[in-house]
């Protein structure tokens, strides 16, 4: 729930007249109802309408009194996302460009796997981290999303899957934006979708990825939540990582590893390192050896990512043979590593690419 204190703390939050009803955790809905002189058990009914029956309006909540429905309408909106573009890949990946109520656009991706359906969600409109290989940073950061706007991405995809009686089984927070720069809303989102009164998606089926906002890594380590944790690393040496990710100048590799060690001491959980391979930049055997030396001794897994080409960026894909050699060298050195399966390569699958293309069309 967005309070005045939250707005003061998070200057990039939108200033809507009413906040999304999806931004309330179950306990917050209970407390709000009691404050309004309503019965606490109504929260369960409201959440059933929102997350099991997945209604699009408060008026459809027919087992609530008219007075309570009006009270809800006076204070909240049922956030709806308008589909601007839908691209479907031959491998079943679907990329959505959604329009928010203030006209900004965001991306959400549905990825189909043998083990279920995964949704990649966005946490910000744009991004200010400035990774030099990423289309998400084109145009900078416009604003943060409310927790309810992040929840709505999952719900909107779930509604599309309802027609074929499928369900969203995994969530990855790897879309546009840096989740740890919208930390409180991200945490509310996690607690909402994990709640068995809501979508009941297991914590171990949810992954949060960060570019390495070190203070928030310490905060995340102290949270009582079993969410999977991933770090975009992409290079073991500061010189190369700073070139790829300017955030490294503020939070360098040494400090990042220290924060990850703290996370593991607190949680005893494995960390995934995401390592995008860029031709001639970080994809040689010497880079694999540097990476292995850096993370040796950590409980970790390396996810090697053959990057999607972004026309606005100059990086090129690593040759397939070099990718296999890189993986083989890591394994030889005792590092658990896999190559991520490419999905959506025949559509605008790179993070932020579809939104960037749409912005170009709008400004012509």
UniProtKB/Swiss-Prot annotation:
Catalytic reactions of this protein: adenosine(2503) in 23S rRNA + 2 reduced [2Fe-2S]-[ferredoxin] + 2 S-adenosyl-L-methionine = 2-methyladenosine(2503) in 23S rRNA + 5'-deoxyadenosine + L-methionine + 2 oxidized [2Fe-2S]-[ferredoxin] + S-adenosyl-L-homocysteine; adenosine(37) in tRNA + 2 reduced [2Fe-2S]-[ferredoxin] + 2 S-adenosyl-L-methionine = 2-methyladenosine(37) in tRNA + 5'-deoxyadenosine + L-methionine + 2 oxidized [2Fe-2S]-[ferredoxin] + S-adenosyl-L-homocysteine
Q: Binding positions for S-adenosyl-L-methionine?
A: 177-178, 209, 232-234, 308
Respond yes or no to whether keyword Endoplasmic reticulum is given for this record: no
- Identify which cofactors the protein needs according to its UniProt entry: [4Fe-4S] cluster
- Kindly indicate whether the keyword Nucleotide-binding belongs to this entry: no
Q: Where is the active site?
A: 107, 351
Annotated Pfam families: Radical_SAM (PF04055), RlmN_N (PF21016)
Q: List the disulfide bonds.
A: 120-351
**Function, in words:** Specifically methylates position 2 of adenine 2503 in 23S rRNA and position 2 of adenine 37 in tRNAs. Confers resistance to some classes of antibiotics.
What's the protein name? Probable dual-specificity RNA methyltransferase RlmN
Q: Source species, please?
A: Staphylococcus aureus (strain MSSA476)
Chain's gene name? rlmN
């Amino acid at each position: 729930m967005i309070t005045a204190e939250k707005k003061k703390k998070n200057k990039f939050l939108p200033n809507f007249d009413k906040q999304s009803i999806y931004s309330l955790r179950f306990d917050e809905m209970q407390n709000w109802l009691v404050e309004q002189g309503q019965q606490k058990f109504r929260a369960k009914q409201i959440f059933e309408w929102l997350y099991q029956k997945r209604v699009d309006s408060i008026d459809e909540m027919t087992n609530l009194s008219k007075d309570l429905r009006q009270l809800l309408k006076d204070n909240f909106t049922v956030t709806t996302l308008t589909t601007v573009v839908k691209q479907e890949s031959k491998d079943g990946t679907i990329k959505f460009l959604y329009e928010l109520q203030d006209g900004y656009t965001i991306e959400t991706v549905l990825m189909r796997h043998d083990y279920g359906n995964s949704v990649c969600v966005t946490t910000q409109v744009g991004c200010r981290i400035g990774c030099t290989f990423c289309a998400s940073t084109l145009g900078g950061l416009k604003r943060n999303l409310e927790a309810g706007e992040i929840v709505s991405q999952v719900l909107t995809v779930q509604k599309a899957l309802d027609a074929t009686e499928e369900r969203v089984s995994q969530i990855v927070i790897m879309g546009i934006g840096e989740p740890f720069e919208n930390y409180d809303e991200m945490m509310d989102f996690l607690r909402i979708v994990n709640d068995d009164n809501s979508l009941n998606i297991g914590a171990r089926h949810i992954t949060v990825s960060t570019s390495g906002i070190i203070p928030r890594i310490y905060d995340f380590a102290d949270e009582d939540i079993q969410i999977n944790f991933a770090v975009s690393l992409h290079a073991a040496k500061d010189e190369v990582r700073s070139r790829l990710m300017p955030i490294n100048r503020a939070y360098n590799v040494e400090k990042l590893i220290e924060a990850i060690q703290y996370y593991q001491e607190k949680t005893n959980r494995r960390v995934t390192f995401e390592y995008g391979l860029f031709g001639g930049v970080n994809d040689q055997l010497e880079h694999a050896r540097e990476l292995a030396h850096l993370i040796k001794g950590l409980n970790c897994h390396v996810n090697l990512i053959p990057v999607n080409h972004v026309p606005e960026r100059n990086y090129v894909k690593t040759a397939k043979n070099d990718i296999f050699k890189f993986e083989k060298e890591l394994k030889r050195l005792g590092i658990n590593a896999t190559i991520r399966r490419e999905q959506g390569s025949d559509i605008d699958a790179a993070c932020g690419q579809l939104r960037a293309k749409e912005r170009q069309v709008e400004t012509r």
